[in-house]
Amino acid sequence: MDSSPDLSLKLRRGSSDSRDNFYMDFAQGIDSDIEEVDNTANNQEAGEVPPPPLPTVSLAEEVLLLVAPPPPPPSLLGQPLPTLTETDDIPPTPTPPPQQKDDEGDDEDEREEPVPEQDQGAPAAPSPPGSPINSVLELELIPPPPLSPMDDAGLRTDDDGEGEETDDAEEVAAIPPPHEMLDIESNPDEEEEEEEQEQASQEDTPKEEDEEEDDDKSTPPPPLPPLPSNFSYVQGHNLGQVTPPLTKSPSNSPSPPVTPPPCPELNISRMVSPPAQHISQIPPLTPSDESEGEAESQPNSPPLRLDAEQPPPDMDQPEPEDQPPEPENEPEPEPEPEPEPEPVSGAREDYSRSLDNEDESTTITTPPSNGYSASSIIAPPPEHFAELDEDRGFIPPPPLEQEPEEEVEEEEEEEEEELTKETDEISVDRESLQDQGGDSISSPRPASILTGSISTSVGGGAGGSPKPESRGPSRSGSQRSQLRSGSQQGSIAESRGGSRIGSRTGSVASAQAAGVLSPQASLKSQTSIRSQGQAGVRSPAGSIKSGSQRMQSPQAGEGAPAMPSPPLMRSPPPELARQMHSPPRITTPPRVCSPPLVSSPPKLAESAAAAVGVAATVKEQIGSSSSTAEPLEPSKPEPLKPPIATVSYQDEQKPSPPPTAAAAPAVTTTAATTAVTSQPRSHFTSSHHHYHLPHQFQHPHHQNHHTHSVRVPTPTVPSSYAPPPPPDSGSSSSPVDRRRLFMAGVAPPIAAGAGSLMAMPAEPAVAISPGRVSARSGSQHHVTIDESSLPSHKGNIQETPGPSGLIIGGGDGDGDRDIGGGGGPDSSDPPSSPGGSSSQPALSGSQADGQLALMYHSHQLTNYPVLPAIKRTHRPSFVYPPMPRVKAGDALATLFSALYGKLLVVMGIAFPMAEVISTYIPPSFYEVYYLYLYIGSMIFLLFMYATLIWGRPKLPVPIASPSKSATKASGTDSMDESDTDSNSVHHRLPPPIPVRRPSLLSPLGRRDAHYGSFYLRMGAVAFGIGSMIYSGLEFGQYFELNPDTKCHNVLLALTPATRMAFIFIQMYFIFLNNEQIKVYRYKIIARFGLMHMIGTNLAVWLNVLIQETKHEILTFYNPENRTLRISHRIPGHSRGHAIIQHDPTAHLRVPRGLKGPYQIFECRRTNIIGTLVQDASPFLFPCTIEYSLICAAILYVMWRSISRPQTPTPQRPDMISSPMKRSPHHYSVDCARAHKGLFVGILILVLTIISLIIFFVLISRPEFVAMAVTEVTICELLIYGTATIATLVGMIQIRHLQYDAYRSFSLDDILLVGAQTGSFLYNIFTVIAGHFTLRSDDMLVPINALASIVQTACQTMFILDASRRQAVSPEHLRKKPGREIVTFMLVVNLAMWAISTLEKSRAESHPIQLNFYGLWAWTIITHVSMPLAIFYRFHSTVCLCEIWKRAYKLKPTYMXEFARSRIQSIAQQQQFCEDLKTNLSYCYCSTTLAGGELETVEEVDSGESNSAEDAGAGAGSGGSRGSGGGAGAAEAGEAGEEGQQGGDSSCGLKAPIRALSPQSLNTEKAFCPVYVINGE
């Protein structure tokens, strides 16, 4: 390992070739393990010519390929196994080798003088196959292309990645074990440590990753080779530890070995897929057998891998041969990368080991640099695509071949061992591993970056940096890999799920890119395949641990098998993706991101090397399938990556100071990839971010990881946004990947950062910052990520902007592609990140099979985004897939529950009506029906409370390990919620939400104020009290009934008592637990229970209405003479009219039908309590009706939210961030600019009360009835006129506030419009009666009714408009336009409510209408309409209170909505976010920008919690900036739903923590992650 440290130092300093060799060696070790598992496949593929990875390969094709891996390309077969000196071979093979060498030389010069030595050493060192470093150097033999060639290298990386992939896969199969094994063997203790760490990390991915980070830090990284004079170990703390960490690095290798086994199968495909450039790589087919065995042992994953691998071949057409031609990016750059990658490989390996030692912090940093650097560097001019194709064709993976099979086998054995361990650990901590998988994934993403799928390819294979972190350490430290195994498995999971999805996504993205860059497309598809292969192979064999874990995970239902589906979708989209993201393919250079592998901290480097090896193996397999997926082969990725890594290291270590270029280098140093410099960084960021995100993604909606990552690159993202088109065309895919990688580089390192964070700290804070941020933001448990590196990360971002300007721009495009292309293979991860970043990483990787549902949703999103990827505006498409995916069973249950509720309501109408209409029906015959309603509702409520209590203990579990719990708990516990949430907001599946939602009833994202506003629920309580009094009086009335009469029935006492209990329990349910009653587990029970309660409330309403109408009529009915006793009221009003004759036949219509044995008047209220009930009922029964209306409406909204995949569920950030941030029951009042309206309203209220008192005094005396009616009518007319004028003035004033057109029709709006119907009914009947009344002195009655109609219509419009208005500027906050009117209307509606309740509710108060319609008709009209009219006045008050309180606050939520509505393009949004950041203390805007469009305003409210995740993740990812910086974009894209909601929410997050400046991105990252963590 000494040579390894030397190599890492030299390579890190400036030797791309050495680093490449080193990484290649590591990758070989990993790949060898993988190939041990997958070598059979590799042999098969070697035998077969793997078709070049075809982005267009369908999942089915992929499966076919997996089943029957195509023979390795003739080139692969023809290529002799590369010898350790393959570096020499590589330079000759590539046409550009001189350039590569020159570039290498430059890079070496930049990085360090020792680099050349390492390059030389690489060729020389490689000769000893046993030496891991030599093996790595061999792998690195392909000299990493110089920075400028790196673009070519990037392209060539595709070729190299593919060709090397194939060879590397083979070599890795044979050689990687030595290098990895050497690491492992060299540091068995470390290996054990790694295993322990992996286990621990698997158990506590968040902790583990952080701990791993610490452990890695504590465990000195493997001694770095002496850095060149100009390079210093930026990873100081970790580098310092580098020498000791070697143990760790090896311990990582054990973990990686487990992870690699799955990769090997992919390698097989990939090996076959990429041209067999170096059969030497193929020789380790023996590992392939193991790998195959492992794959077989993990049939699900291997087939998927094969699918992934073979489909890419189909995509790329001829697997190996076609790939070389197909990789457009590969042709020219690849040759250069081959030479340069040698140094990089060597340096990378050394550095990788150092990084491995530093695994987490270094890894985190390195991948970002690589991703970015690769992207920048790799993005070659379109003309280079042909070169890439050529390069790809001739790039052999030298070191991999040369790596001894012994090492491969040993590594594989170790991997298998660890795989077993990790498998258990992984299965246990798969989610954590998957979270870690983000690292691994980030590594594959760097590979993807190298590939055409810059992020994906690099992320997938070369991305190995993060992956090496997970992968190389995976090989060298399989245990650590377990730590990373989460990463690796996450990487595998992500590779496999993410890679598969990503790879398929990548494939799609690759295919898209391929459209422009055939090679890149190939690479990407290879990456895709490789990712898939990695996902598949690693899962099964490559990373036995990861594979086993994945297998377990798939067995758990989250395995790769599930992931393949998304890849399938991805696969077909790839062609589109190609065309759409063909330019991103150009970005293929990011594949050069192989440096990310190198850039991985020493541990990361090892991990990266192992990861690269695994990735290479997987990529080779995939590469064989997807020739373009250069990253697949560690050597190929490494060659490309190494250059990037070299540059990164040089820059990072040397330039670490420079914020832009140096910062990126710093990040590179940190990330080892940053060496690639700012150029690759963009890509690298994408790839790394992508990978890292998946790893941390998995955890809590690793959007946060994405978020961090994005956040880190956020500054760049803006530039990305500006240049999104170029990236779209040339680097859209890779930019997204880059952005992802950037994020990944930042975030993935963090993801690895959980595991890789340790390594990352070793690297300059620059890289750590991104990673740290990433860990913090994405992996809520990773909050510990070095913030010191935040500046560096910012530097990265800044540096990235230049190169990543396009790249990030591409990343931006890729953000869509992230969403759309999914950032190449990694895209699946980011898409997963967007869809359910936390669950998707797990899903894509470990949970590919089982969690496919969640993952698949995200991947579908990813697939969808593939097409939309081109346009950032297509984020919505990203949002749409998350849209509720309703299962057939759920739809059926919803339908039946709705029919059941309708049946209850119809019966509630029929029973009381039949009793009143017919005299042959005994009284209270239907009371049993109401007992059934009340008791059934109470049982359901008690069940809900019980589940709420039972569920509470579970909340901490998901919270404890958000990644595991988020994905697994989400998959199981929150499966329903994830089903809903994932469906509604797949990506939204916020880890925080899963954390808090595990309970059966978890908080329904507090939409507005829960379900309905606080005032509405207060009104429900007040009306409930009145209703309980009413029921209590009815209950007492029973004891006065004569036992001998037919009216005496025990049910008459039992029903009111039961109703009283029901009202009380339901009141508690509605008022207090409304926010907590969110059903996730027992959806069918919840649907029928809620619908039963809705039916109960409506039946109560109808029953009370009919009973009260009956009793009021009977009050005036005289059974003796069968007349109505209301004549005493009429005479005063009649003025000579013969009002109602006492002629017995005059009103026989009243008792008509009462010829049966049962007369309704027999049981009327006659006794003391009966009289009291009758007198109080006009005031009490409206309370029952209004209470039932409110409860029915609230319950209906809850039922609908269950039926539809809880789109409202997106917990608001405030709910997520902190359990409740502020108690939901804490309210504050600001009376500014409300005094005039308040006191004028009080004056009107006083006049109204006086008028009512006069009315009741006069109406009691027959001679003054007319005067009483006239007095009240005049008072009403005055109030209506004043209120109408005030409403019109208010509508003019409130127009100054910002209108939110996205706000959906809310519960308050529904109740308001519904209640207004009652007012209209009453007034229309009154106008008709007044018009046909001949008396002129009564004309005030119809005029008053018309005035009431006009006033209610204006008021309804005013309320509906004002409820969508929001103050958005300081002027609004200062002037508060319209607030005086709102205050006045609030008080006036209270006055009108009093009039309606006290005066209008009594039929005898309106002699004209009573005389015109008759007693029966008018009483019925009054009892039906007046409760609604009363409720309209009350609810208008409620709505005005809500407007008064909310419209004049500058809420980030609404501002985000405003931003969304105002900002069309992401770039504009980005700028808007910048402005907001500058002007406001929150960065919610960043999430908004990232999301692009809120799904709905409703979701915004509800989405605020999402926003917490989003802001935590989206804002955390700098979501708004640069579309969330790739991952952020994807996440933001997903967050777009959620993030936009969250965007609003982001504000809701109170992202104030986020700094206002682009640099605040770091702060932002830190901030959002912190929130997420808190929410977690």
Curated annotation (Swiss-Prot):
Residues 1513-1528 have a biased composition (Gly residues). Residues 229-241, 362-376, 434-457, 519-534, 545-555, 776-799, 962-973 have a biased composition (Polar residues). GO terms for cellular component: membrane; plasma membrane. InterPro entries: Otopetrin (IPR004878). Residues 1-602, 621-736, 771-845, 962-1001, 1498-1549 are annotated as: Disordered. GO terms for molecular function: proton channel activity. Residues 103-116, 159-171, 186-198, 206-216, 316-341, 402-419 have a biased composition (Acidic residues). Residues 58-67, 76-85, 243-252, 465-507, 661-685, 826-839, 1503-1512 have a biased composition (Low complexity). The chain crosses the membrane at residues 741-761, 891-911, 931-951, 1019-1039, 1051-1071, 1084-1104, 1179-1199, 1239-1259, 1272-1292, 1310-1330, 1340-1360, 1381-1401, 1412-1432. Residues 219-228, 253-264, 563-575 have a biased composition (Pro residues). The keyword Magnesium does not apply. It is found in: Cell membrane. Residues 347-356, 384-393, 420-433 have a biased composition (Basic and acidic residues). It comes from the Eukaryota. Residues 686-709 have a biased composition (Basic residues). One of its GO terms (biological process) is proton transmembrane transport. Proton-selective channel that specifically transports protons into cells. Proton-selective channel activity is probably required in cell types that use changes in intracellular pH for cell signaling or to regulate biochemical or developmental processes. Belongs to the otopetrin family. This is Proton channel OtopLc. The gene is OtopLc.
